[in-house]
């Protein structure tokens, strides 16, 4: 109950969520590249879940309107409008589809290269990346919420470690392929469960009408 939020805060916080970064370098899009190399961070999601800190209290609105005042003692969600923003690199972090509003935005396959004005709802993690990848002429903070940060519950961390141990123990062993797949699916689902939106429109199928959508009301969402 201490973490329960109202529907307004829920909608606000959901807009801050975004998926992983997958994007082609615009200089090489459409070309066949040979003799390339790559690497992968093994079990990156579960590693971050046990090593980093997350919101452990309810997010609350605060009056801060200065980016320099967003200290790392808290988790932050920021509704911010940038003006005269531009990317420093060929690979661009900000996604146009996640912006709330924009004016004269130049994009590279959906990623923002520059814009006269663009508005987002971001986390403090996003802001750390954006500060490294972009420069801007000015900004206006429209709304800010903050929560105290801490490590995830010990029981959850222990479960993640248990699943990771099972995954690595069975990996590459032909006689334990099913056990490996089960452990891998389990550890992958931990993150997925944390970011699944449970408050959605209803979907109903009947033989007479086929598929229909039952829009979620604010009252039902709050319940």
Outline where the language-model segments fall:
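Conserved acidic
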Residues: 1-223
